[in-house]
């Protein structure tokens, strides 16, 4: 029914056709709409009859009128009959297909309108409240006026009655350019409401237009989407607001707690200062009393000595005035002895007197404490430590990490974190993932030795400085363990080979003494081999072989199950780099591949990556790659060497050279 209704709708007024005219182009148009088109083409004071042509609003075909004007066009009786039957068959209601778009808009407005509507037909003053609004008449009626104006007979039975709504809602929005025309379409180009005449003869003639319902649906959907986003954003803001309020509360509580703590700590400092003041004051008083007591005793002794000396001085002076020799000699000896004794006794008192002990050396110096008090402030997290890679040391299974801190005074402890480094790309993810790190907590020194590490492996280390206020971490530092150290196993050496006392050098020795047979010993004629004393089953390892003038030798690796009576590389259990005079080959399972090193290596480096299945040979002095075996190792492997002339010396336990380390470097 909706599709049929759209076919019965006038393209100008967007209502069901009323008195439709059949145009020569086979389209239809309401008589009144056609008349409005002619009026819009008229100049001022020009009669409508002077217009003899107009364009079909549907196909733009030019319709030429006869002298009769619009009356000369045929009425589309068939279409009018279809419309009449359509209206009769339609069921009245808010979802009825007979409803016009205007009526649906009226219903929508009715639902939202709470204004008091008065009867527009009443002669009474004031008018009665309206009980119905006739959409067809565009008038609101009270019950009495409704019965008088809308008897239950045609054509009034076809009028649409709805709940009362204001007059402005009935009439709808009017066109700004054509005041008597209602807006019934939307100009997409200018983004504004227009009427049919605006599209036919106005400035919107060539603009893109759309039906109100289409634009309504689009804008409503857009508004709903924006509203949903706004509601979502408001919800997020409300959540944020709640967090901010909660944070403010926490700030208030924590600030109050810190203020109380500050008062408590300052009171404690004041208490300590007052206590120390009392203790030091007591010491001063005791020192003063002791010194004054001692000085008072010395003063009394001096006065007593002076009094005794004064009497003796008087007698001596009187004796000196005696001119009679006999009388003088009679008393002089006694007086002289007494003067000598008095002089000696006064001399004894002098060492006991210390005139410099006046408390001026009792100094009070609180400058250090004043500086500390002046520096009182919030405790902050310590500065990040710095890993000193140049001081760090490593073995094949340990690394000793050294670091420094310019803020050691505020550091309570350190925490060492480390993990295997697989490339620069994983540094950020590793730093953000606590599960990836091994952690050593509560370190008090500026160094720590980590044990049980994989040999020949690169690690990332970070050091965290910690105190009560928080912690800060150092920049990542890259350190690596050395390769697994090993020596030559004399029990495996061929009878015609001699192993040095330090088990690091092997040489051909025809005069070598007979050796007892062991399961590990190489036995074949010409297979003058010796094995290392270690079997490797994981990790990355690097060692070097010094070629001491030998021109016939083989260097490689072998499983424990490799036959001892065959040359290394002649079976599936061993891999070797061989030199036979000036011929160089790599050999595995009796398959030989020639290589041409230039210059001839004087030191060969071997890099074993057990986990990734590779055995690589290098010219160690010139950093030149010679060859790499790619193999899935299924058993532990042992370094193996064959010498036909001169000697070979091994250097083991080395770190993997940086130019051979394929992992990406830290910045």
UniProtKB/Swiss-Prot annotation:
Describe the location of the B30.2/SPRY domain by residue ranges.
Answer: 482-659
| EC number(s) stated in the UniProt entry for this protein | 2.3.2.27
The GO molecular function terms of this record are:
enzyme binding; identical protein binding; microtubule binding; phosphoprotein binding; protein homodimerization activity; transferase activity; ubiquitin protein ligase binding; zinc ion binding
Where the record annotates domain COS, the positions are 320-379
Binding of Zn(2+) 3 occurs at 175, 178, 198, 204
InterPro entries tied to this protein:
B30.2/SPRY (IPR001870), B30.2/SPRY_sf (IPR043136), Bbox_C (IPR003649), Butyrophylin_SPRY (IPR003879), ConA-like_dom_sf (IPR013320), COS_domain (IPR017903), E3_ligase_FN3/SPRY (IPR050617), FN3_dom (IPR003961)
Query: What is the name listed in the Swiss-Prot or TrEMBL entry for this protein?
Result: E3 ubiquitin-protein ligase Midline-1
Q: Which organism is it from?
A: Rattus norvegicus (Rat)
Q: Which gene encodes it?
A: Mid1
């Amino acid at each position: 029914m909706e599709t049929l209704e759209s076919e019965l709708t006038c393209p100008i007024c967007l209502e069901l056709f009323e008195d439709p005219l059949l145009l020569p182009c086979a389209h239809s148009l309401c008589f009144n709409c056609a008349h409005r088109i002619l009026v819009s083409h008229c100049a001022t004071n020009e009669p409508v009859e002077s217009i003899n042509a107009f364009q079909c609003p549907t196909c733009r075909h030019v319709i030429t009128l006869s002298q009769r004007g619009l009356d000369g066009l045929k009425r589309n009786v068939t279409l009018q009959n279809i419309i009449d039957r359509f209206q009769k068959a339609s069921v009245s209601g808010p979802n009825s297909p007979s409803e016009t778009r205007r009526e649906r808009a009226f219903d929508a407005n009715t639902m939202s309108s709470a204004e008091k509507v008065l009867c527009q037909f009443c002669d009474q003053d004031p008018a009665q409240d309206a009980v119905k609004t006739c959409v067809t008449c565009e008038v609101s009626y009270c019950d009495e006026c409704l019965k008088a104006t809308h008897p239950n007979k045609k054509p009034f039975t076809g009028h649409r009655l709805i709940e009362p709504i204001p007059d402005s809602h009935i009439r709808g929005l009017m066109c700004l350019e054509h005041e008597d025309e209602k807006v019934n379409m939307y100009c997409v180009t200018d983004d504004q409401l227009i009427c049919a005449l605006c599209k036919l003869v106005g400035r919107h003639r060539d603009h893109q237009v759309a039906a109100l319902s289409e634009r309504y649906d689009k804008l409503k959907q857009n508004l709903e989407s924006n509203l949903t986003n706004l509601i979502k954003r408001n919800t997020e803001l409300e959540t944020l607001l709640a967090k901010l309020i909660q944070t403010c509360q926490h700030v208030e509580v924590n600030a109050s707690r810190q203020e109380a703590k500050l008062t408590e700590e300052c009171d404690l400092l004041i208490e300590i200062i007052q206590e120390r003041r009392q203790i030091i004051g007591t010491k001063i008083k005791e020192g003063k009393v002791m010194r004054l007591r001692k000085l008072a005793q010395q003063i009394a002794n001096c006065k007593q000595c002076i009094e005794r000396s004064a009497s003796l001085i008087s007698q001596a002076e009187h004796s000196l005035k005696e001119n009679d020799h006999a009388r003088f000699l009679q008393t002089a000896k006694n007086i002289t002895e007494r003067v000598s004794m008095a002089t000696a006794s006064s001399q004894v008192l002098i060492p006991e007197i210390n005139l410099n002990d006046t408390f001026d050396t009792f100094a009070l110096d609180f400058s250090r404490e004043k500086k500390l008090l002046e520096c009182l402030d919030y405790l902050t997290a310590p500065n990040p430590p710095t890993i000193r890679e140049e001081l760090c040391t490593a073995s094949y299974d340990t690394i000793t990490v050294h670091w420094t801190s310019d803020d050691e005074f505020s550091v309570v402890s350190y925490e060492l974190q480390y993990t295997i480094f697989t490339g620069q790309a994983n540094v950020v993810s590793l730093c953000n993932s606590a599960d990836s790190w091994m952690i050593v907590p509560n370190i008090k020194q500026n160094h720590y030795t980590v044990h049980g590490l994989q040999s020949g492996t690169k690690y990332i280390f970070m050091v965290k400085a910690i105190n009560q206020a928080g912690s800060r971490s150092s920049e990542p530092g890259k350190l690596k363990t050395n390769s697994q150290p090993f020596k030559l196993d004399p029990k495996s050496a061929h009878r015609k080979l001699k192993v040095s006392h330090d088990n690091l050098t092997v040489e051909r020795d025809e005069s070598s003494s007979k050796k007892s047979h062991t399961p590990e010993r190489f036995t074949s004629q010409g297979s003058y081999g010796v094995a290392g004393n270690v079997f490797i089953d994981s990790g990355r390892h690097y060692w070097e072989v010094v070629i001491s003038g030998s021109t016939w030798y083989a260097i490689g690796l072998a499983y424990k199950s490799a036959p001892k009576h065959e040359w290394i590389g002649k079976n599936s259990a061993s891999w070797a780099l061989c030199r036979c005079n000036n011929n160089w080959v790599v050999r595995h399972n009796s398959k030989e591949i020639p290589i041409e090193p230039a210059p001839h290596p004087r030191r060969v480096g071997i890099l074993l990556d057990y986990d990734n299945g590779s055995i690589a040979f290098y010219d160690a002095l010139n950093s030149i790659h010679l060859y790499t075996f790619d193999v899935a190792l299924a058993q532990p492997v042992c370094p193996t060497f064959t010498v036909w002339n001169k000697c070979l010396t091994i250097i083991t336990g080395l770190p993997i050279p940086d130019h051979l380390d394929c992992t990406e470097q830290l910045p």
